[in-house]
Swiss-Prot record:
This is F420 non-reducing hydrogenase II small subunit. [3Fe-4S] cluster binds at residues 311, 330, 333. One of its GO terms (cellular component) is [Ni-Fe] hydrogenase complex. Pfam families: NiFe_hyd_SSU_C, Oxidored_q6. GO terms for molecular function: 3 iron, 4 sulfur cluster binding; 4 iron, 4 sulfur cluster binding; electron transfer activity; ferredoxin hydrogenase activity; metal ion binding; Methanosarcina-phenazine hydrogenase activity. It comes from Methanosarcina mazei (strain ATCC BAA-159 / DSM 3647 / Goe1 / Go1 / JCM 11833 / OCM 88). Its EC number is 1.12.98.3. Keywords: 3Fe-4S, 4Fe-4S, Cell membrane, Iron, Iron-sulfur, Membrane, Metal-binding, Methanogenesis, Oxidoreductase, Signal. Residues 1-51 form the signal peptide.
Length: 386
């Protein structure tokens, strides 16, 4: 177990003394960012229950073209696990294709049985009832020729399913790179134009080609990208919406960036590079050129200088590690252009450099945060020929 730092202990004590019910959106977001899902839900358990007044929130989670990796990430969220978190937030997970037991039952092309046994009937009933949060995992094929028939579940395309589900949703959250902007399924290939995989609100960086736009549905979408998305990003975003700390649509312009990502987790002015555990090697201009080393991974294709996410602060796997710490270069899976913008994944982007600088001189000129902290010292030492 990782021991809590003195600063974090002091911050936790400060937050514990605050009135949860009187927190504005800004204070709430600072609290969830600092504490993480585990500590936040634990610290404010009683207050959360009081705030909810036992009002149940329905959650419908549908799957398009994907690997279910984001659901698996959520299930590996640690303590509290997803079941405990949903219980504390008083969420009724009404539908999730991986976790629910119902199966689609058909007879001569017609749905049979009841919603207790038949997931297709259950979904139709839930759509009619409305008043739910919709989570979408996976991309939506528009091909061939706008039919959406590259993904058909039962006798319905997923494109149709999304349209029906989105129509009566109180809030829509796209989870994972595929649902946000197409992800792996929309990568450049010989068949990409034919399949035409899209995200809920974007296709790569193009909001005009999001599937909701194609369907003529004008509703805001919160994007939680990643391949997979971090469990904290998912749980805390849902928690903020459920608790009314992010009001839709009023608070979204201030809370989200231009691609619909919560600025709290995907800060426009911060990159994974700035808090990378290998940052010290970068500042000294020391780079690994083979896998298995301990130095900066830039020359092995690391994209951390362009990845706007809090991975370096939040960490993964119970807050103990992250890609670069484990020896894997960051592939910037939170970017709308992923994976094409990151390819080739494990080759240095020689024509790009870090923030436009040449990698061979970047440690000497110190960019970004390095110019304010360790980089200033490095520049002075190098200027003296040390």
């Amino acid at each position: 177990m990782v021991e809590m730092s003195t600063g974090m202990k002091n911050l936790t004590r400060t937050l514990e003394s605050m009135d949860f019910l009187k927190m504005d959106r800004r204070t709430f977001m600072k609290a969830v960012s600092a504490l993480g899902a585990t500590a936040f839900l634990g610290t404010y358990q009683t207050e959360i229950v009081n705030a909810l007044e036992f009002a149940e929130t329905k959650l419908i989670w549908i799957h398009g073209s994907e690997c279910t990796g984001c659901s698996e990430s959520l299930l590996n969220g640690g303590n509290p696990d997803v079941a405990q978190a949903l219980t504390k937030l008083n969420v009724n997970l009404a539908y999730h294709e991986t976790l629910c037991m119902q199966q689609g039952i058909w007879n001569d092309g017609e749905l049979v049985n009841t919603s207790e046994l038949n997931s297709e009937i259950l979904l139709e009933d839930l759509y009619k009832e409305g008043n739910y949060i919709l989570v979408v995992e996976g991309s939506i094929p528009n091909g061939p020729d706008g039919s959406g028939r590259y993904l058909v579940i039962g006798n319905k395309t997923f494109k149709e399913t999304l349209g029906e589900a989105a129509e009566n949703a109180n809030a829509i959250v796209a989870v994972g790179a595929c649902a946000c902007w197409g992800g792996i399924t929309s990568a450049d290939s010989d068949i990409e134009k034919e399949t035409d995989y899209r995200g809920v609100a974007f296709k790569k960086t193009d909001a005009s080609k999001g599937m909701l736009k194609e369907l003529g549905i004008d509703k805001p979408v919160i994007n939680i990208p990643g391949c997979p998305a971090h469990p904290d990003w998912i749980l805390l975003t849902l928690g903020a919406v459920i608790l009314g700390k992010i009001k839709i649509p009023d608070d979204l312009p201030a809370a989200l960036d231009q691609y619909g990502r919560p600025k709290l987790f995907f800060p426009p002015d911060h990159t994974v590079h700035e808090n990378c555990p290998r940052r010290g090697y970068y500042d000294r201009g020391e780079f690994d050129e083979e896998v298995g080393g301990e130095k900066c991974l830039w020359k092995l294709g690391c994209k951390a200088p362009y990845a706007h996410a809090d991975c370096g602060i939040r960490r993964w796997n119970g807050s103990v590690s992250m890609c670069t710490q484990a020896g894997g270069p960051c592939i910037n899976c939170v970017d709308p252009g992923f994976p094409d913008a990151s390819r080739p994944l494990y080759v240095e982007a020689e024509d790009k450099g870090i923030v436009g600088a040449n990698i061979d001189t970047v440690a000497k000129v110190a960019v970004g945060a390095a110019a304010v902290a360790a980089g200033v010292h490095a520049v002075r030492r190098m200027g003296k020929g040390e």
